[in-house]
């Protein structure tokens, strides 16, 4: 919300270049950010929240990483994995226990907020959290404040929170309350890329790796390296983009003789 128009244009350029595919989402995201900046300034929209659904490896986490990079963060991405918060007392671990109890010095959520230098939080595996943890975010998204167990308030007005989940559309409606669903600014399903899109991704990723290698390691690379890597990667074998990316990296390392 603090970016001027030129900085916002630069933000979107870096964001678009950092996130491959998902063109429809990118357009929706630009509209969301534009509206958010307006209504945040007049005090009507505290937090921009995205709830991204889909199988593992389809690019949900990459959205948060792309935002993180585009904002120019100098710290690591602030991430809380809700897979660790499924027990009945999980909320205490997240926001700290009351005074006198173990963990009363704080909680992971507050620690991650304090670590972030760009106002961005990734909440991973949202569907695995205990109901008390899920319900806690009703107030966070509504009021733009994180409150610990000792009633200390932390202002997160202007933050972006990206929630990711492997949940299906059907289970989303049955497992997430209408009250919480209505508080998410964007709710979307990320699908697996087609083989055609995956081939385009391989070209994109290999060019990206070669560019970085030349910048940070050496200008000296084998002739025809790009095409050789592309030829060795059979995209039909990989549904998960994470596995496809690993194959690209392994092939690159093999062909440069590292």
What does each model-identified segment do?
Residues 80, 121-122:
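Hydrophobic positions in the central parallel beta-sheet of the AAA+
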Residues 65, 99-104, 125-136, 141-199, ...:
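Canonical AAA+ ATPase core
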Residues 45-47, 73, 88, 114-117, ...:
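Short loop/turn elements that form and flank the Walker-type P-loop nucleotide-binding site
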Residues 54, 124-125:
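The Walker A (P-loop) glycine that initiates the GxxxxGKT/S ATP-binding motif of P-loop NTPases
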Residues 8-48, 252:
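Pre-Walker A (pre-P-loop) alpha-helix and adjacent loop at the N terminus of AAA/AAA+ ATPase modules
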Residues 2-4, 18-22, 74-75, 170-238, ...:
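Conserved C-terminal "switch" segment of AAA+ ATPases
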Residues 70-101:
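AAA+/P-loop NTPase substrate/partner-engagement loops
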Residues 46-80:
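Walker A/P-loop
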